[in-house]
Amino acid sequence: NMTEEEFKKELERLGISVTDEKMHQLEQFYEILIKTNKQMNLTRIVEKEEVYLKHFYDSLTLVKAYSFEGDLSLCDVGSGAGFPGIVLKIFFPNLKVTLIDALQKRINYLNEVIEALGLVGIEAVHVRAEDLARQNRKFDIVTARAVASLPKLLGWCMPLVQKNGVFLAMKGNVEEELD
């Protein structure tokens, strides 16, 4: 688990700038997540210090794989509770973010978070990845977190990745995936 102080220290170690405003946005995000989680299943991780580690910090470890600086578009596939999409948007406001999810009620929740946090240049869209790909939408970065097996994820996400773009899959255990 991770206290807010430890969280800030770890982000500095990753080279991510932390401001009071960003910490306040995370705090609001946490409150809406917990409130909404009582009505619908978004996460089984609800303990604050665990959310900071397993959802917030985990989302930001993607900076080890890719630089989010600059004018980039990002699509978060199966965004669900908003990880990593919303967390990345908070810390990299330059990103143009599209969160997609197949469930309308999750989109409603994501829109509530976006509005409460005053985020701009981010949209939550009720669409499946394969349907978005049919509309020829392309992104610099496509992220997905544990929504399916890796072969399935690749099938859904790769068509959304622009030439010279990247697909960043966040999966639990690498060994499990290789079996």
Task: List the model feature ranges, each with a label.
Residues 2-71, 75, 106-108, 112-122:
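Class I SAM-dependent transferase core
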Residues 17, 41-44, 50-51, 82, ...:
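Residue-level preference for alpha-helix termini and adjacent loops
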Residues 30, 81-86, 126-129:
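Mobile beta-alpha loop/short-helix "lid" or hinge segments that flank ligand
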Residues 75, 84-87, 102:
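Acidic/histidine-rich alpha-helical segments that form the ligand environment
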Residues 78:
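Conserved glycine-centered beta->alpha loop in an early N-terminal alpha/beta scaffold
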Residues 81-94, 155:
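Conserved SAM-binding loop of SAM-dependent methyltransferases across substrates and taxa
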Residues 95-98, 102-179:
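S-adenosylmethionine
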